[in-house]
A protein has these predicted regions:
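Short secondary-structure junctions and interdomain/linker hinges
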Residues: 60, 77-85, 109, 113, ...
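Aromatic- and histidine-enriched alpha-helix N-cap/loop-to-helix transition segments
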Residues: 1, 44-48, 131-134, 202
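Alpha-helix initiation and N-capping motif
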Residues: 50, 67, 71, 99, ...
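Structured C-terminal helix/loop/strand segments within mature extracytoplasmic catalytic/sensor domains
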Residues: 144-254
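Residue-level preference for non-acidic, small/hydrophobic
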Residues: 1-4, 139, 207
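Active-site-adjacent helix/loop patches that line small-molecule binding or acyl-intermediate pockets
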Residues: 5-126, 142
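Penicillin-binding protein/beta-lactamase superfamily catalytic region
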Residues: 104-164, 217-220
């Protein structure tokens, strides 16, 4: 969500220039990826780029203001209030040494746009927000619906961002297993190490699944199978020639 908020505040091209949109082919928490990308975070959908995106969020220099903007934006995407799981936040804060290294390495390369410790703390807090599968599906549906939440009717972000978001999900969403996923399903999707996965078909629907057991890349094993089945059953391959939507039906469902 922070990547979408950053693009909504600055525009897609500025975020592309400051962070990037290229897949790394490496684990989501890789430090080596920064070095191999010529000091560039590469994409806001892995840890380095997400920390960089947190540093960009306005108001710059105001931790409380940034956090309020992020929480409000996520709640608008989800269609209902969200909250941090305090136990998870405390645990992550006590052990996030790798991410701290990433934040300061990015600072060294001028790819952090605010205080690095502030950016890291905000990133850690946002990663500790708990959502339901329904909220995750509503977020996906909002992305699919050109930024308009289909449950609340609220315009959450600029409609021209949906293709950019979907393209990043398609190329980076499953970390180093993205190619296999896209080849198999043709569904732009974003996974998280909490066990949730959201899929987006622009103009059609958003879908989500949740199950904690993860594979080696940090992707939910069961949620992958569920979404792959749904994508095949409903013909959701965005590279295919058919669509599940019929005339007269609602275009976006959560």
């Amino acid at each position: 969500p922070t990547a979408i908020l950053a693009m909504n505040q600055y525009g897609g091209q500025e975020v592309l220039g400051k962070i990037g949109a290229d897949a790394t082919g490496l684990p989501f928490n890789s430090i080596m990826a920064i070095l191999l990308e010529n000091d560039h975070p590469s994409t806001p959908l892995v840890n380095a780029g997400a920390i960089s995106a947190c540093s960009m969020i306005k108001p710059v220099g105001d931790s409380d203001g940034k956090w309020k903007a992020i929480v409000s934006f996520i709640a608008d995407l989800a269609g209902s209030d969200v909250a941090v799981i305090d136990e998870l936040y405390k645990s992550e804060t006590a052990t996030n040494f790798n991410n701290k290294s990433i934040a300061w390495l990015l600072k060294n390369y001028n790819r952090i746009y605010d205080d690095p410790d502030m950016a890291l703390d905000i990133y850690t807090r946002q990663c500790s927000i708990g959502v339901t599968a329904r909220q995750l599906a509503t977020m996906a549906a909002t992305i699919a619906n050109s930024g308009v939440n289909p449950v609340t009717g609220k315009a959450v972000f600029k409609p021209e961002l949906t293709p950019k978001i979907a393209s990043m999900m398609a190329t980076v969403g499953f970390y180093e297993h993205t190619g296999d996923w896209l080849f198999t399903t043709g569904l732009p999707a974003k996974t998280g190490v909490g066990g949730g996965i959201m899929g987006v078909v622009p103009g059609v629907m958003g879908v989500a699944a949740f199950a904690p057991p993860l594979d080696g890349a940090g992707n939910s094993v069961k949620a992958q199978k569920a979404l792959a089945f749904i994508a095949g059953h409903l013909n959701l391959n965005v590279f295919g020639t058919t669509r599940c939507v019929m005339a007269g039906k609602e275009p976006v469902k959560a």
